[in-house]
Amino acid sequence: MLRLITGRAGAGKTAQIMDEIRRAASEHEGGRCLLVPEQYSHEAERELARVAGPSLPLYAEVLSFTGLARKVEAELGTGGRRPVDAGGRLLCMALALDSVYSRLRIYAGARRSPELQGQLLAAVDELSAAGFTAEQTMEAAERAPGALGQKLADLALVMGAFHAAIGPEHSDASDRLSELLRRLPESSFGRSGHIYIDGFTDFTGVEMKLLCELMSRGADMTVCLTLDALDEGSEVFELSRRTARRLLREARERGVPSRVETLEARSVRSADILAEHMLSYTEQHFDSDNSVFLYTAESVTAECELAASRAIELARSGCRWRDIAVAVRSF
């Protein structure tokens, strides 16, 4: 069963699934997993432990996609392959460029540029995250016109040479999720229980394939997505809307039952109204709840001083620095 829980920010999606996990733990029902983005995993684990209590680890766990890969590796083993660290990856990229630089039309100069080597490594990571192999990238290069096709062809050559430099006896971090996708059918994970997914706007190509594999394995799956409506609505939520439609389509194609639950926000906040109408230049007026303030300043310097003073004031009142953001158009 695939269940989508949708609603605007503050509607209570996260609170609902955490309460469901808490109730399952209190009834001694195991097999609950909360899948969240890597950067949110520690905070989610702390919050879930606060809600569910000290018995939580017996019945539920919080994982990122990388954490799920580690869990499956612990179950099935690594096959004797040793992971390559960051320094080793850079060395392998340098070796890869040495082997193919004479065939490169755009990135031949990267052979003597450590900075460009790092950028090529990031490009290889992006392609791997999207589920592209060197062969598929070369096929895309043949269809792309002009300079774009040449760049993709170079990336395909570099990608193939990089994986050859890594070798079969080592594993690369960029291929970790692809390896997880390949080995997941052998694992017991997801054959029962309930998988909750929260904190995502969309998924990479490999992550989406993993979700499709998981929803077909027997465990129930609940995905929380922040959006106003599934059919149409604000452009702000378009990415989440496409993700929801894709998940429902994949479930339908696999014969997996699905349903959508929409949670209404408890109250409309000024911040929500600002997010909805900030760029629409409407003449509508709204009552403020004193959470949004509009200031004018004589200069950019004065604007910066005001922003800095407000940030310091918030920090001194107990707000964490990491919860304060300064957004600018351009200076």
Regions found by a protein language model. Name each.
Residues 28-146:
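Conserved P-loop NTPase-based nucleic-acid remodeling module centered on helicase motor cores
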Residues 74, 78, 164-168, 313:
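General structural signal for alpha-helix termini and helix-helix connectors
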Residues 1-4, 99-199, 206, 231-235, ...:
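Accessory N-terminal region flanking or inserted into the helicase ATPase core
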